[in-house]
Design a protein with these regions (language model features):
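Conserved GNAT acetyl-CoA-binding A-motif
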Residues: 45-57, 225-237
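Conserved acetyl-CoA-binding loop-helix of GNAT-fold acetyltransferases
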Residues: 31-43, 204, 210-227, 246, ...
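N-terminal charged segments
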Residues: 1-48, 62-63, 83
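Conserved catalytic-core motifs of GNAT/GCN5-like acyltransferases
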Residues: 56, 71-87, 236, 254-269
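C-terminal "cap" of GNAT-fold acetyltransferases
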Residues: 80-105, 116, 261-280
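Conserved active-site tyrosine of GNAT-family acetyltransferases
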Residues: 64-67, 89, 247-248
């Protein structure tokens, strides 16, 4: 079985670390935990010597975390309660991890996604389907869909036990059905402290590609988040595939930055683009 990185709650904050991605990821920090987090980051790096540390922090903590060996890879304006920016700050402890070999290709993908370079588009065929919030009864079918779409993934979303746990912990999944068959899925992970939501895990059955189902499901997920008064939506997606970047750009998300060699996918480290959208 694949060994995924560990997610550790520290006070009101959250860190992920491990050798699957060979990194430490400060996913969420609460101001009350700054001293604890500083010590934990130091201890982890001293123990494991990870190649990269990435930290998502509010602008007010920039002076603490933006040291001379740290670079800002992305920024989401008004991430915290629609007021304070979130910074994605990275330290590359292994210089080779900072080598951006795909830079030109990624920039071209961004420009195409934003409509600055024209490409031919397939016509979207009308389709009748149902979108709804997933329940525990859907877990097996969602995992089956993810196994068919993703060869590897940063989190074990193809495993029913894991999916059940994160649903119990509050992550919401949404599905699209055609003839009572789940053919698309996606997740919303709300950060109540920030009033922000990560839109993630979007997948469509290969047999139903080209019908605009991802766009429809993303729009539905956004509407559900607006009803909860969430202020900002964002995604961290693979930087090189055109479809997922064009999906978010087409849904009026703004490009925020690129996390270089951030995530292990199919045995290599890939860069990830960040897109965000103000919902309220």
């Amino acid at each position: 079985m694949m060994k995924y990185d560990t997610i550790v709650p520290i006070g009101k904050s959250t860190i992920q670390h491990g050798f699957f991605n060979d990194r430490i990821y400060l996913m969420k920090i609460h101001p009350d935990d700054v001293v604890l987090i500083d010590q934990y980051l130091t201890d982890l790096q001293g123990l494991y010597q990870y190649a990269k540390i990435i930290m998502k922090v509010p602008l007010s903590l920039e002076k603490i975390y933006k040291t001379p060996d740290t670079i800002e890879e992305a920024r989401i304006p008004g991430f915290y309660q629609g007021v304070e920016d979130a910074l994605f700050l990275s330290r590359f402890l292994d210089p080779t991890r900072a080598e951006d070999d795909a830079h030109d290709k990624i920039q071209e993908i961004i420009q195409i996604s934003l409509g600055k370079i024209s490409v031919s588009k397939k016509g979207i065929h009308p389709v009748t389907w149902v979108m709804r919030k997933a329940t525990m009864n859907d877990v097996t079918h969602i995992c089956s869909l993810y196994r068919s779409v993703f060869e590897t993934y940063p989190f074990p979303i193809q495993e029913p036990d894991y999916l059940k746990k994160i649903i119990q912990d509050g992550i919401e999944f949404f599905v699209g059905e055609i003839s009572d068959r789940i053919v698309a899925a996606g997740s919303c992970e709300i950060d109540p402290y920030a009033s922000a939501v990560e839109m993630s895990d979007l997948a469509v059955d290969e047999a139903y590609k080209g019908l605009g189902l991802s766009k429809k499901l993303l729009s539905y997920m956004e509407k559900q988040m607006k009803m909860k008064n969430v202020k900002t939506a964002y995604t961290i997606c693979r930087a090189e595939p055109l479809p997922v970047n064009r999906l978010f750009a087409g849904a009026q998300y703004q490009y925020s930055g690129t996390l270089i060699n951030n995530t292990q996918i199919c045995g290599t480290y890939e860069s990830m683009n960040i897109w965000y959208k103000t919902l309220h």
